[in-house]
Amino acid sequence: MNVDWSFHFEEQFERIIATIVLAQSYEDGIEWHERIGGQISLLANFPLMGDNVPARCFTQPPDDLERLRQLIISPYRVVYEIVGEQCRVLAIVRCSSMLVRNELLWDK
């Protein structure tokens, strides 16, 4: 299975890593990049490893909530969907943040 990242996810991920580098260290940024990227790469072989995203995680749940899955890489939540032979990584947010449904659309 192919694992692809949306532009929205890429922007969020870059911001998170940049924040870690500024607040902590370059080495911590690299460590988090590898940790999160490594977990996401496992989706190629184990696309169902993430749980369904609970409705309570949304400001307003989408009508097609069942399509969304999540990987918890504490303190972050990576949201993805499976479409055919493609695993689409849609967003990454802190677990304490509510998800906004219009930010979970495929944009590539």
Per-segment meaning from a language model:
Residues E66-R77, E81-K108:
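Enriched for short, Lys/Arg-rich terminal
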Residues M1-L68, K108:
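Basic, Lys/Arg-enriched alpha-helical interface segments
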